[in-house]
């Protein structure tokens, strides 16, 4: 039973009747819940009083009654004052007495429940009360009847499933059944069953339980034309029969076109049936009696057989079967390192199908060895084959190498690539990516002769400074030097890359910068004016000044020039290395350029001097009296007695030294500024590369 709350649906109704009449009185109650109190409650009730409350609730509900207070005169068998609860033909309970002392006669916590939708409550007091009694306070409510439980064994119960709801119930059926018009019984729905698979199983409803009565079932097997269906009944076969008349009640019948098998019934299953058709109808009928288990059959479809297949050379066929028939499909694939070739098209697999006429949908393809094709061209590198006839097929090997001695392979990988089964050249480390050839830096082919004591510099030997770049106006007039970094960057002085500023207001604006089309870069240059067969003229793509460059003090006097195209590296063109560690005082460095070199005239060819690096504080002290500032991003070099220095026209040029351990030349500084070229105690001031190395590498991506 479920208790119901209708407070949200109905206004609370309280019946409190105070009757003074001696004669009987009847009250009709039709609400879903309410309150009943003795006359005069909570005062004492009158003598010789009788009140009856008739409580009626809707069908599908019962009346539930309980007492909150009970105080009546006590008597044997409740002969004097009492409360009687009854239905039409049955007394449900009789109560009297005090709930504090007469626990056996009072209702206490007892709940009275009517069997139906009606309950009558009668209060009766006799002619006298020796004491004061306050009567009773009772409440009633309608509660739902669970018809599913109470009708479980009745004839009107549901066939399959019963569902209770507030005030009623309804029936439903198992899957495959439909509810009868009586809303109680279930009948089977077994018509229109369609089977389209090549194999399957069909049974009577509820098999192996007894099949439903009054059934008209139909099953259709409908396959593609070209299949022929065979039926096989299982051993358990039980359809109601008659000893004299064949299959008068229940039976199963098979139809295929104009052919008919059956009807079948009894306990002996039919023999296998070869229908020779792709469309079959199975009809099953039962009457309204009997408890037979039914039947079960399996069906299988077969088609015309196709010729046996032979796999291609270096290939296989899946699945491998002794016989292939209509609709069977096979997948042709090749061994590792081979691909399927069909009609000049290369593919991983190829599928064919057995047709209804017994022929295959296509011919068997061939298996062709994987060819990785001509290897990609490596920039600044070359490729060699492992075979004489330059094979590029599966498992063939090639080796990439860089153009030596001007380029080297990044990470020192082997450069060996193998043709993979996927048709790609693959390296163990780099996979499908090509290696990278980096320019070799600081290793010129030509070595210098001893020049440490050459006064006022000397002509440089051609090829000993292959990293030097000439910044030239379009008319061929040089105006600064630079150093090649990597394959397409030139490092120079920032002051070389902008027009002169107003001395009174030396503020650099974008409008002061040179345009990339204003000048060009010449590599491999030896003679200042005369053309050289080894020189290369390169266009400028982009220029960038150091973000902290100060044109007034020459702090961070560095600029980068990006080239539109990379120069060809050779004996006369090679980048210089970036420093790995700071430079120390006394280290001998070489400065190169096409400046005046104290001759008060420009030289015909490239000049160079060898000078020592000067102590930072010594250089500061030399320039402080002149009001010049030497900062931490600068480095000084020169002889105390003078005579060797970079002069006008050398700006931006390289100051280099040789790393004895690595036998490579690296860039120490860039010619920046000075005072009184080559005079005593007047050292050359250069932009120091080491503290600016991070900025250079971040912009250019150059690594040694």
UniProtKB/Swiss-Prot annotation:
Interaction with MBL1 as annotated region, ranges: 25-305
Activity regulation as described: Inhibited by SERPING1 and A2M.
Domain EGF-like, residue spans: 144-187
Job description of the protein: Functions in the lectin pathway of complement, which performs a key role in innate immunity by recognizing pathogens through patterns of sugar moieties and neutralizing them. The lectin pathway is triggered upon binding of mannan-binding lectin (MBL) and ficolins to sugar moieties which leads to activation of the associated proteases MASP1 and MASP2. Functions as an endopeptidase and may activate MASP2 or C2 or directly activate C3 the key component of complement reaction. Isoform 2 may have an inhibitory effect on the activation of the lectin pathway of complement or may cleave IGFBP5.
Compartments where located: Secreted
Modification comment: The iron and 2-oxoglutarate dependent 3-hydroxylation of aspartate and asparagine is (R) stereospecific within EGF domains. N-glycosylated. Some N-linked glycan are of the complex-type.
Record family assignment: Belongs to the peptidase S1 family.
InterPro entries, alphabetized: CUB_dom (IPR000859), EGF-like_Ca-bd_dom (IPR001881), EGF-like_dom (IPR000742), EGF_Ca-bd_CS (IPR018097), NOTCH1_EGF-like (IPR049883), Pept_S1A_C1r/C1S/mannan-bd (IPR024175), Peptidase_S1_PA (IPR009003), Peptidase_S1_PA_chymotrypsin (IPR043504)
One Pfam family it belongs to: Sushi
Protein encoded by which gene: Masp1
Record's subunit section: Homodimer. Interacts with the oligomeric lectins MBL2, FCN2 and FCN3; triggers the lectin pathway of complement through activation of C3. Interacts with SERPING1. Interacts with COLEC11; probably triggers the lectin pathway of complement.
Protein's UniProt name: Mannan-binding lectin serine protease 1
Ranges where the record places region Homodimerization: 25-189
Site (Cleavage): 453-454
Chief site of localization: secreted
Record PANTHER family: COMPLEMENT COMPONENT 1, S SUBCOMPONENT-RELATED (PTHR24255), MANNAN-BINDING LECTIN SERINE PROTEASE 1 (PTHR24255:SF13)
Phenotype upon changing residue 651 to A: Prevents protease self-activation through proteolytic cleavage into heavy and light chain
Gene Ontology terms: biological process: complement activation; complement activation, lectin pathway; proteolysis
Domain Sushi: 304-369, 370-439
Ranges for domain Peptidase S1: 454-701
Organ and tissue specificity: Protein of the plasma which is primarily expressed by liver.
Positions bearing (3R)-3-hydroxyasparagine: 164
Origin organism lineage: Eukaryota, Metazoa, Chordata, Craniata, Vertebrata
Active-site residues (renumbered): 495, 557, 651
Annotated region described as Interaction with MBL2, given as residue ranges: 25-189
Annotated stretches, region: Interaction with FCN2: 25-283
Glycosylation sites: 54, 183, 390, 412
Species whose genome carries this gene: Rattus norvegicus
């Amino acid at each position: 039973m479920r208790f119901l709350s209708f407070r949200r649906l109905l206004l609370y109704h309280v019946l409190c009747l105070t009757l003074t009449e001696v004669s009987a009185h009847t009250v009709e109650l039709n609400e879903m819940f309410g309150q009943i109190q003795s006359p005069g409650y909570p005062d004492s009730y009158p003598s010789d009083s009788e009140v009856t409350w008739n409580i009626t609730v809707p069908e599908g509900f019962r009346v539930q009654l309980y007492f909150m207070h009970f105080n009546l005169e006590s008597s044997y068998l409740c002969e004097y004052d009492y409360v009687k609860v009854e239905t039409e033909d049955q007394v449900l309970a009789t109560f009297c007495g005090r709930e504090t002392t007469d626990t056996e006669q009072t209702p206490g916590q007892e709940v009275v429940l009517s069997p139906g939708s009606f309950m009558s409550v009668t209060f009766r007091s006799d002619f006298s009360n020796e004491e004061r009694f306050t009567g009773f306070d009772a409440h009633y409510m309608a509660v739902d009847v669970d018809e599913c439980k109470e009708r479980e064994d009745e004839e009107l119960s549901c066939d399959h499933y019963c569902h209770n709801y507030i005030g009623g119930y309804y029936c439903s059926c198992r899957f495959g059944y439909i509810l009868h018009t009586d809303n109680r019984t279930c009948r089977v729905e077994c018509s229109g069953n369609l089977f389209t698979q090549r194999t399957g199983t069909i049974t009577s409803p509820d098999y192996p339980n007894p099949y439903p009565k009054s059934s008209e079932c139909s099953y259709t097997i409908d396959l593609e034309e070209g299949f022929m269906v065979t039926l096989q009944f299982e051993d358990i076969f039980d359809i109601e029969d008659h000893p004299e008349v064949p299959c008068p009640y229940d039976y199963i019948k098979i139809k295929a076109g104009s052919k008919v098998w059956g009807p079948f019934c009894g306990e002996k299953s039919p023999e296998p049936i070869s229908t020779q058709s792709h469309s079959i109808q199975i009809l099953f009928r039962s009457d309204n009696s009997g408890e037979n288990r039914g039947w079960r059959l399996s069906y299988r479809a077969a088609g015309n057989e196709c010729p046996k297949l032979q796999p291609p050379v270096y290939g296989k066929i899946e699945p491998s079967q002794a016989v292939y028939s209509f609709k069977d499909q096979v997948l042709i694939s090749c061994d590792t390192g081979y691909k399927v070739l069909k009609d000049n098209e290369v593919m991983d697999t190829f599928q064919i199908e057995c047709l209804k006429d017994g022929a295959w949908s296509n011919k068997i393809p061939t298996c062709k060895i994987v060819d990785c094709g001509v290897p990609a061209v490596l920039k600044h590198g070359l490729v060699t084959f492992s075979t004489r006839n330059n094979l590029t097929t599966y498992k063939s090997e090639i080796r990439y190498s860089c153009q030596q001695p001007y380029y080297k392979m990044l990470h020192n990988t082997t450069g060996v690539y193998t043709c993979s089964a996927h048709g790609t050249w693959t390296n163990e480390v780099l996979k499908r990516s090509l290696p990278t050839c980096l320019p070799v830096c600081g290793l010129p082919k030509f070595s210098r002769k001893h020049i440490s004591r050459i006064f006022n510099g000397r002509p440089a030997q051609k090829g000993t400074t292959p990293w030097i770049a000439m910044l030239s106006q379009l008319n061929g007039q040089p105006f600064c030097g630079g150093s090649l970094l990597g394959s397409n960057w030139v490092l120079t002085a920032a002051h070389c890359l902008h027009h002169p500023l107003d001395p009174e207001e030396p503020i650099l604006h974008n409008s002061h910068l040179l345009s990339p089309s204003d000048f060009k870069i010449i590599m491999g240059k030896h003679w200042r004016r005369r053309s050289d067969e080894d020189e290369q003229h390169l266009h400028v793509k982009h220029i960038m000044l150091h973000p902290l460059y100060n044109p007034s003090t020459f702090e961070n006097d560095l600029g980068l020039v990006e080239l539109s195209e990379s120069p060809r590296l050779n004996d006369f063109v090679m980048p210089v290395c970036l420093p790995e560690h700071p430079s120390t005082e006394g280290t001998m460095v070489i400065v190169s350029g096409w400046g005046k070199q104290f001759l008060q005239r420009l030289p015909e060819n490239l000049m160079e001097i060898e000078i020592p690096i000067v102590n930072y504080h010594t250089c500061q002290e030399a320039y402080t009296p002149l009001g010049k500032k030497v900062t931490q991003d600068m480095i000084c070099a020169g002889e105390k007695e003078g005579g060797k220095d970079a002069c006008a026209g050398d700006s931006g040029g390289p100051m280099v030294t040789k790393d004895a351990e690595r036998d490579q030349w690296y860039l120490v500084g860039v010619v920046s500024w000075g005072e009184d070229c080559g005079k005593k105690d007047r050292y050359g001031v250069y932009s120091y590369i080491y503290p600016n190395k991070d900025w250079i590498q971040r912009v250019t991506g150059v690594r040694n």
